[in-house]
Amino acid sequence: MQSVIAQAKRIVVKVGSSLVTNDGKGLDHDAIARWAAQIARLRVAGKEVVLVSSGAIAEGMQRLGWARRPKEIHELQAAAAVGQMGLAQVYESQFTRYGIRTAQVLLTHADLADRERYLNARSTLLTLLSLGVVPIINENDTVVTDEIKFGDNDTLGALVTNLIEGDALVILTDQRGLYTADPRKDPAAQFVDEALAGTPELEAMAGGAGTSIGRGGMLTKILAAKRAAKSGAHTTIASGREANVLERLAAGEAIGTQLLAPTGRLTARKQWMADHLQLRGRVVIDGGAVEKLTSGGKSLLPIGVVEVQGEFARGEVIACVDAQGKEVARGITNYSSAESRLIARKPSSEIESVLGHLNEPELIHRDNLVLV
Protein backbone atom coordinates (compact mmCIF):
# COMPACT_ATOMS: atom_id res chain seq x y z
CA MET A 1 0.00 0.00 0.00
CA GLN A 2 1.37 3.38 -1.03
CA SER A 3 0.65 6.70 0.62
CA VAL A 4 -2.01 8.72 -1.21
CA ILE A 5 0.10 11.79 -0.50
CA ALA A 6 2.74 10.64 -2.99
CA GLN A 7 0.67 11.67 -6.01
CA ALA A 8 -0.82 14.78 -4.45
CA LYS A 9 0.23 18.11 -5.93
CA ARG A 10 -1.61 20.45 -3.55
CA ILE A 11 -1.66 19.46 0.12
CA VAL A 12 -3.22 20.95 3.23
CA VAL A 13 -1.33 20.02 6.39
CA LYS A 14 -3.02 20.43 9.76
CA VAL A 15 -0.72 20.37 12.78
CA GLY A 16 -2.33 19.95 16.20
CA SER A 17 -1.59 21.93 19.35
CA SER A 18 0.35 19.13 21.01
CA LEU A 19 2.81 19.08 18.09
CA VAL A 20 3.74 22.77 18.19
CA THR A 21 3.62 23.55 21.91
CA ASN A 22 5.51 22.52 25.01
CA ASP A 23 2.64 20.56 26.52
CA GLY A 24 0.49 23.66 26.18
CA LYS A 25 3.08 25.93 27.80
CA GLY A 26 3.91 28.18 24.88
CA LEU A 27 5.27 27.32 21.46
CA ASP A 28 7.89 24.64 20.87
CA HIS A 29 10.30 26.49 18.58
CA ASP A 30 12.32 23.37 17.81
CA ALA A 31 9.21 21.47 16.72
CA ILE A 32 8.10 24.32 14.48
CA ALA A 33 11.60 24.41 12.99
CA ARG A 34 11.23 20.74 12.06
CA TRP A 35 7.85 21.33 10.41
CA ALA A 36 9.26 24.23 8.43
CA ALA A 37 12.18 22.09 7.27
CA GLN A 38 9.90 19.28 6.10
CA ILE A 39 7.51 21.60 4.29
CA ALA A 40 10.46 23.32 2.62
CA ARG A 41 11.61 19.96 1.27
CA LEU A 42 8.08 19.19 0.05
CA ARG A 43 8.20 22.47 -1.82
CA VAL A 44 11.47 21.44 -3.46
CA ALA A 45 9.73 18.22 -4.53
CA GLY A 46 7.16 20.32 -6.40
CA LYS A 47 4.27 20.21 -3.95
CA GLU A 48 2.14 23.18 -2.93
CA VAL A 49 1.51 23.26 0.82
CA VAL A 50 -1.01 25.14 2.93
CA LEU A 51 -0.49 24.87 6.67
CA VAL A 52 -3.31 24.95 9.21
CA SER A 53 -1.60 25.36 12.54
CA SER A 54 -2.97 25.31 16.04
CA GLY A 55 -1.04 26.82 18.91
CA ALA A 56 -2.21 30.44 19.13
CA ILE A 57 -4.26 30.01 22.29
CA ALA A 58 -1.56 27.92 23.97
CA GLU A 59 1.03 30.60 23.16
CA GLY A 60 -1.32 33.31 24.40
CA MET A 61 -1.87 31.46 27.66
CA GLN A 62 1.89 31.28 28.15
CA ARG A 63 2.39 34.97 27.42
CA LEU A 64 -0.45 35.93 29.75
CA GLY A 65 0.73 33.60 32.51
CA TRP A 66 -2.36 31.40 32.51
CA ALA A 67 -1.78 27.81 33.66
CA ARG A 68 -5.19 26.47 32.58
CA ARG A 69 -7.14 26.90 29.38
CA PRO A 70 -9.95 29.38 30.14
CA LYS A 71 -13.58 28.47 29.56
CA GLU A 72 -15.00 31.94 28.91
CA ILE A 73 -14.97 32.75 25.21
CA HIS A 74 -13.79 36.34 25.71
CA GLU A 75 -10.74 35.04 27.58
CA LEU A 76 -10.04 32.49 24.85
CA GLN A 77 -10.33 35.26 22.28
CA ALA A 78 -7.87 37.40 24.21
CA ALA A 79 -5.41 34.52 24.46
CA ALA A 80 -5.74 33.85 20.73
CA ALA A 81 -5.11 37.49 19.88
CA VAL A 82 -1.95 37.57 21.99
CA GLY A 83 -0.73 34.16 20.84
CA GLN A 84 -1.36 34.72 17.15
CA MET A 85 1.43 37.30 17.13
CA GLY A 86 3.95 34.80 18.45
CA LEU A 87 2.75 31.98 16.20
CA ALA A 88 3.18 34.07 13.06
CA GLN A 89 6.59 35.33 14.16
CA VAL A 90 8.00 31.87 14.85
CA TYR A 91 6.79 30.40 11.56
CA GLU A 92 8.08 33.38 9.61
CA SER A 93 11.53 33.17 11.19
CA GLN A 94 11.80 29.43 10.55
CA PHE A 95 10.65 29.51 6.92
CA THR A 96 12.93 32.47 6.17
CA ARG A 97 15.87 30.12 6.69
CA TYR A 98 14.79 28.33 3.50
CA GLY A 99 14.02 31.47 1.52
CA ILE A 100 10.27 30.87 1.83
CA ARG A 101 7.80 33.63 2.56
CA THR A 102 4.77 32.95 4.71
CA ALA A 103 1.36 34.61 4.91
CA GLN A 104 -1.00 34.69 7.86
CA VAL A 105 -4.61 34.02 6.88
CA LEU A 106 -7.33 34.16 9.56
CA LEU A 107 -10.74 32.86 8.52
CA THR A 108 -14.21 32.74 10.03
CA HIS A 109 -17.26 30.73 9.10
CA ALA A 110 -18.84 33.92 7.76
CA ASP A 111 -15.98 34.23 5.27
CA LEU A 112 -16.83 30.84 3.81
CA ALA A 113 -20.62 31.09 4.11
CA ASP A 114 -20.83 34.26 2.01
CA ARG A 115 -20.30 33.37 -1.65
CA GLU A 116 -18.38 36.54 -2.56
CA ARG A 117 -16.09 36.35 0.45
CA TYR A 118 -15.59 32.63 -0.19
CA LEU A 119 -14.42 33.35 -3.73
CA ASN A 120 -12.19 36.18 -2.51
CA ALA A 121 -10.55 33.89 0.06
CA ARG A 122 -10.05 31.23 -2.60
CA SER A 123 -8.51 33.74 -5.01
CA THR A 124 -6.14 35.04 -2.33
CA LEU A 125 -4.95 31.58 -1.33
CA LEU A 126 -4.42 30.45 -4.91
CA THR A 127 -2.50 33.65 -5.63
CA LEU A 128 -0.28 33.08 -2.60
CA LEU A 129 0.47 29.54 -3.78
CA SER A 130 1.29 30.77 -7.27
CA LEU A 131 3.75 33.22 -5.71
CA GLY A 132 5.50 30.42 -3.83
CA VAL A 133 4.20 31.57 -0.45
CA VAL A 134 3.19 29.14 2.30
CA PRO A 135 -0.16 30.30 3.74
CA ILE A 136 -0.48 29.64 7.48
CA ILE A 137 -4.14 29.47 8.37
CA ASN A 138 -6.03 29.63 11.62
CA GLU A 139 -9.52 30.54 12.73
CA ASN A 140 -9.98 34.20 13.57
CA ASP A 141 -10.86 33.41 17.18
CA THR A 142 -10.94 37.07 18.19
CA VAL A 143 -14.18 37.83 16.36
CA VAL A 144 -16.16 34.58 16.41
CA THR A 145 -18.64 33.24 18.93
CA ASP A 146 -19.51 29.69 19.95
CA GLU A 147 -22.44 29.71 17.55
CA ILE A 148 -20.33 30.51 14.50
CA LYS A 149 -17.07 28.71 15.20
CA PHE A 150 -15.59 26.09 12.91
CA GLY A 151 -15.22 24.15 16.16
CA ASP A 152 -11.70 22.83 15.61
CA ASN A 153 -8.84 23.07 13.16
CA ASP A 154 -9.57 19.61 11.75
CA THR A 155 -12.80 21.00 10.31
CA LEU A 156 -11.01 24.15 9.18
CA GLY A 157 -8.39 22.03 7.43
CA ALA A 158 -11.07 20.16 5.50
CA LEU A 159 -12.84 23.36 4.52
CA VAL A 160 -9.60 24.89 3.29
CA THR A 161 -8.86 21.71 1.32
CA ASN A 162 -12.18 22.07 -0.43
CA LEU A 163 -11.73 25.82 -0.86
CA ILE A 164 -8.49 25.46 -2.82
CA GLU A 165 -9.41 22.11 -4.42
CA GLY A 166 -6.57 20.37 -2.65
CA ASP A 167 -5.59 16.84 -3.56
CA ALA A 168 -4.98 15.67 -0.01
CA LEU A 169 -5.43 16.62 3.63
CA VAL A 170 -2.84 15.50 6.17
CA ILE A 171 -4.01 15.65 9.79
CA LEU A 172 -1.07 15.29 12.15
CA THR A 173 -1.82 14.42 15.74
CA ASP A 174 -0.20 12.76 18.76
CA GLN A 175 -1.91 9.45 17.93
CA ARG A 176 -0.86 6.80 15.41
CA GLY A 177 -4.16 6.94 13.57
CA LEU A 178 -7.58 5.30 13.81
CA TYR A 179 -8.34 2.10 15.70
CA THR A 180 -11.51 0.01 15.67
CA ALA A 181 -11.85 0.89 19.37
CA ASP A 182 -9.92 2.82 22.00
CA PRO A 183 -6.70 0.77 22.37
CA ARG A 184 -6.25 2.13 25.89
CA LYS A 185 -9.46 0.43 26.96
CA ASP A 186 -9.85 -2.46 24.52
CA PRO A 187 -6.87 -4.82 24.01
CA ALA A 188 -8.62 -6.27 20.96
CA ALA A 189 -8.63 -2.94 19.14
CA GLN A 190 -7.25 -3.20 15.60
CA PHE A 191 -5.42 -0.46 13.73
CA VAL A 192 -7.17 0.82 10.59
CA ASP A 193 -4.64 1.23 7.78
CA GLU A 194 -7.09 2.26 5.09
CA ALA A 195 -10.81 2.87 4.71
CA LEU A 196 -13.28 4.79 2.59
CA ALA A 197 -13.95 8.28 3.94
CA GLY A 198 -17.54 8.78 5.04
CA THR A 199 -18.15 5.14 5.96
CA PRO A 200 -20.66 5.20 8.87
CA GLU A 201 -18.70 2.59 10.83
CA LEU A 202 -15.73 4.96 11.10
CA GLU A 203 -17.64 7.39 13.31
CA ALA A 204 -18.52 4.58 15.70
CA MET A 205 -14.83 3.69 15.99
CA ALA A 206 -13.73 7.23 16.84
CA GLY A 207 -13.19 8.29 20.43
CA GLY A 208 -14.34 11.37 22.31
CA ALA A 209 -12.94 14.85 22.80
CA GLY A 210 -9.35 15.97 22.60
CA THR A 211 -6.90 17.14 25.23
CA SER A 212 -7.08 20.19 27.47
CA ILE A 213 -4.66 21.91 25.09
CA GLY A 214 -6.57 21.32 21.86
CA ARG A 215 -10.20 20.72 20.91
CA GLY A 216 -10.18 17.98 18.31
CA GLY A 217 -10.62 14.30 19.12
CA MET A 218 -10.51 11.45 16.61
CA LEU A 219 -14.18 11.93 15.71
CA THR A 220 -13.51 15.44 14.40
CA LYS A 221 -10.77 14.01 12.20
CA ILE A 222 -13.09 11.35 10.78
CA LEU A 223 -15.70 14.00 10.01
CA ALA A 224 -13.06 16.26 8.49
CA ALA A 225 -12.00 13.45 6.16
CA LYS A 226 -15.62 12.90 5.18
CA ARG A 227 -15.96 16.59 4.36
CA ALA A 228 -12.70 16.75 2.39
CA ALA A 229 -13.74 13.68 0.40
CA LYS A 230 -16.64 15.63 -1.10
CA SER A 231 -14.14 17.56 -3.19
CA GLY A 232 -12.24 14.39 -4.10
CA ALA A 233 -9.43 14.87 -1.56
CA HIS A 234 -7.91 11.92 0.29
CA THR A 235 -7.03 12.26 3.99
CA THR A 236 -4.19 10.81 6.02
CA ILE A 237 -4.35 10.83 9.82
CA ALA A 238 -0.89 10.18 11.21
CA SER A 239 1.31 10.76 14.22
CA GLY A 240 3.33 13.93 14.10
CA ARG A 241 5.81 12.20 16.41
CA GLU A 242 7.01 10.06 13.50
CA ALA A 243 10.37 11.31 12.27
CA ASN A 244 10.12 13.21 8.97
CA VAL A 245 6.53 12.08 8.61
CA LEU A 246 5.63 14.54 5.84
CA GLU A 247 8.62 13.65 3.70
CA ARG A 248 8.00 9.94 4.14
CA LEU A 249 4.35 10.30 3.20
CA ALA A 250 5.31 12.31 0.13
CA ALA A 251 7.81 9.61 -0.80
CA GLY A 252 5.01 7.03 -0.80
CA GLU A 253 5.39 5.42 2.61
CA ALA A 254 2.03 4.46 4.10
CA ILE A 255 1.97 5.94 7.59
CA GLY A 256 -1.10 6.26 9.76
CA THR A 257 -4.66 5.82 8.55
CA GLN A 258 -5.56 6.63 4.97
CA LEU A 259 -9.18 7.64 4.35
CA LEU A 260 -9.84 7.56 0.63
CA ALA A 261 -12.28 9.76 -1.23
CA PRO A 262 -14.86 8.07 -3.45
CA THR A 263 -14.52 8.68 -7.16
CA GLY A 264 -15.68 12.09 -8.32
CA ARG A 265 -15.96 15.52 -6.76
CA LEU A 266 -18.66 18.13 -6.39
CA THR A 267 -18.67 21.21 -8.55
CA ALA A 268 -17.18 24.28 -6.87
CA ARG A 269 -20.61 25.84 -6.37
CA LYS A 270 -22.10 22.71 -4.81
CA GLN A 271 -18.99 22.28 -2.67
CA TRP A 272 -19.57 25.76 -1.27
CA MET A 273 -23.14 24.84 -0.37
CA ALA A 274 -22.10 21.56 1.23
CA ASP A 275 -19.48 23.30 3.36
CA HIS A 276 -21.91 25.58 5.20
CA LEU A 277 -21.61 24.73 8.90
CA GLN A 278 -24.55 26.82 10.06
CA LEU A 279 -27.75 27.38 8.12
CA ARG A 280 -30.41 30.03 8.74
CA GLY A 281 -33.32 27.71 8.13
CA ARG A 282 -34.63 24.43 6.82
CA VAL A 283 -37.66 22.87 5.20
CA VAL A 284 -39.23 19.57 6.19
CA ILE A 285 -40.13 17.63 3.05
CA ASP A 286 -42.42 14.65 2.50
CA GLY A 287 -41.41 11.16 1.45
CA GLY A 288 -42.15 11.77 -2.20
CA ALA A 289 -39.89 14.80 -2.29
CA VAL A 290 -37.13 12.87 -0.51
CA GLU A 291 -37.34 10.16 -3.17
CA LYS A 292 -37.28 12.67 -6.03
CA LEU A 293 -34.25 14.47 -4.62
CA THR A 294 -32.18 11.45 -3.63
CA SER A 295 -32.99 9.07 -6.48
CA GLY A 296 -34.40 11.16 -9.28
CA GLY A 297 -32.09 14.16 -9.23
CA LYS A 298 -35.11 16.47 -9.32
CA SER A 299 -35.68 20.01 -8.06
CA LEU A 300 -37.56 20.68 -4.84
CA LEU A 301 -41.06 21.97 -5.54
CA PRO A 302 -43.21 23.81 -2.96
CA ILE A 303 -45.79 21.02 -3.01
CA GLY A 304 -43.27 18.69 -1.35
CA VAL A 305 -42.66 21.02 1.60
CA VAL A 306 -44.45 20.09 4.82
CA GLU A 307 -43.02 22.74 7.15
CA VAL A 308 -40.69 25.75 7.02
CA GLN A 309 -38.38 26.35 10.00
CA GLY A 310 -36.22 29.38 10.75
CA GLU A 311 -35.97 32.74 9.04
CA PHE A 312 -34.10 33.15 5.78
CA ALA A 313 -33.99 35.34 2.70
CA ARG A 314 -34.12 34.44 -0.95
CA GLY A 315 -30.69 33.31 -2.14
CA GLU A 316 -29.59 31.79 1.16
CA VAL A 317 -28.56 28.17 1.63
CA ILE A 318 -31.12 26.12 3.57
CA ALA A 319 -31.38 22.47 4.59
CA CYS A 320 -33.94 19.95 3.36
CA VAL A 321 -34.80 17.39 6.05
CA ASP A 322 -37.10 14.39 6.14
CA ALA A 323 -39.90 13.78 8.64
CA GLN A 324 -37.38 12.44 11.19
CA GLY A 325 -35.24 15.57 10.94
CA LYS A 326 -32.41 13.94 8.98
CA GLU A 327 -30.81 16.27 6.45
CA VAL A 328 -30.96 14.83 2.95
CA ALA A 329 -29.97 17.87 0.90
CA ARG A 330 -29.29 21.57 0.99
CA GLY A 331 -29.52 24.30 -1.56
CA ILE A 332 -30.11 27.91 -2.51
CA THR A 333 -33.72 28.89 -2.02
CA ASN A 334 -35.67 30.91 -4.57
CA TYR A 335 -38.05 32.19 -1.90
CA SER A 336 -37.78 33.70 1.58
CA SER A 337 -39.01 31.85 4.66
CA ALA A 338 -42.16 34.00 4.77
CA GLU A 339 -42.91 33.29 1.12
CA SER A 340 -42.08 29.61 1.52
CA ARG A 341 -44.62 29.24 4.32
CA LEU A 342 -47.32 30.67 2.08
CA ILE A 343 -46.61 28.37 -0.87
CA ALA A 344 -45.79 25.17 1.05
CA ARG A 345 -47.94 22.18 0.02
CA LYS A 346 -49.16 24.09 -3.04
CA PRO A 347 -48.52 23.25 -6.70
CA SER A 348 -46.16 25.55 -8.58
CA SER A 349 -49.05 26.73 -10.75
CA GLU A 350 -50.50 28.55 -7.70
CA ILE A 351 -47.32 30.42 -6.64
CA GLU A 352 -48.10 33.59 -8.57
CA SER A 353 -51.69 33.79 -7.36
CA VAL A 354 -50.58 33.30 -3.74
CA LEU A 355 -47.57 35.66 -3.72
CA GLY A 356 -48.49 38.05 -6.50
CA HIS A 357 -45.26 37.19 -8.32
CA LEU A 358 -43.34 34.18 -9.58
CA ASN A 359 -39.57 33.96 -9.03
CA GLU A 360 -39.19 30.36 -10.14
CA PRO A 361 -41.50 27.32 -10.19
CA GLU A 362 -39.05 25.49 -7.89
CA LEU A 363 -38.30 26.28 -4.27
CA ILE A 364 -34.76 24.98 -4.92
CA HIS A 365 -33.61 24.21 -8.46
CA ARG A 366 -31.64 20.99 -8.86
CA ASP A 367 -28.63 22.97 -10.17
CA ASN A 368 -28.54 24.77 -6.83
CA LEU A 369 -29.05 21.67 -4.69
CA VAL A 370 -26.56 19.19 -3.26
CA LEU A 371 -27.22 15.89 -1.49
CA VAL A 372 -25.56 15.37 1.90
Curated annotation (Swiss-Prot):
Keyword flag Translocase: no
Family annotation (CDD domains): AAK_G5K_ProB (cd04242), PUA_G5K (cd21157)
Pathway as given in its UniProt record: Amino-acid biosynthesis; L-proline biosynthesis; L-glutamate 5-semialdehyde from L-glutamate: step 1/2
Binding sites annotated in the UniProt record for substrate: S54, D141, N153
Catalytic function, reaction form: L-glutamate + ATP = L-glutamyl 5-phosphate + ADP
The entry's keywords: Amino-acid biosynthesis, ATP-binding, Cytoplasm, Kinase, Nucleotide-binding, Proline biosynthesis, Transferase
Principal localisation: cytoplasm
GO MF: ATP binding; glutamate 5-kinase activity; RNA binding
KW Cytoplasm (keyword) present: yes
Record GO biological process: L-proline biosynthetic process
SMART domains linked to this entry: PUA (SM00359)
Summary of the function given for this chain in its UniProt record: Catalyzes the transfer of a phosphate group to glutamate to form L-glutamate 5-phosphate.
UniProt-recorded name of the protein: Glutamate 5-kinase
Originating organism: Cupriavidus taiwanensis (strain DSM 17343 / BCRC 17206 / CCUG 44338 / CIP 107171 / LMG 19424 / R1) (Ralstonia taiwanensis (strain LMG 19424))
Chain's gene name: proB
